[in-house]
Amino acid sequence: MDALFHLRDMIASLDVPLTDDLCARARLPRNDDLYALNGAAAPAPEELAGAYAGSTTLAGRVLLLRPFYVRAVLPALCAPGGGAAERNACIAADTACLNSLARRLALSIHVATRKREALPDALQTALGTGDPARVENAITNLSVEAGVLARVEARARKNGADADTVRRLAVLYADVLIPLSRKIQVHGLLAEA
């Protein structure tokens, strides 16, 4: 499991720029006029996880994440509003967030590989069923996730984020980003099974 701990350290190091970028974006309004998705809904997390795990380039992953980012991340992070004055700042902040998010989620694929190599009994049993929910339950480590949330909150406070932004970031991680990361891992594990 040493390789898995090393990957968790790498993820922690990627949470720093992601948290910094999300804090910077949270200071700006959502500015919905910037996002032409042509009515495209955000993909379901399972669908996004499969497509994401199958993509091999940062640019391809950013393209896959964009509808999810616009439909799930921005509303959870930013207040509505905005206009021409913030346009360039919003675009730059969105680009930074998408790149940081794509890098952070890319390590989920490697975490799945390491978990598969370690193959604890609970994971082996879950993989044998082929049930994504059981596999997700087997790989979930609540103490690790609590550590991620504490780290994100501390980094957000260090960035000078107000209490509401710290709370929104923690909720975004807990309800959106960590579950998506798990689903990417599940997809990778079941694809290899």
Model-flagged regions — what are they?
Residues 1-193:
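Extended amphipathic alpha-helical regions
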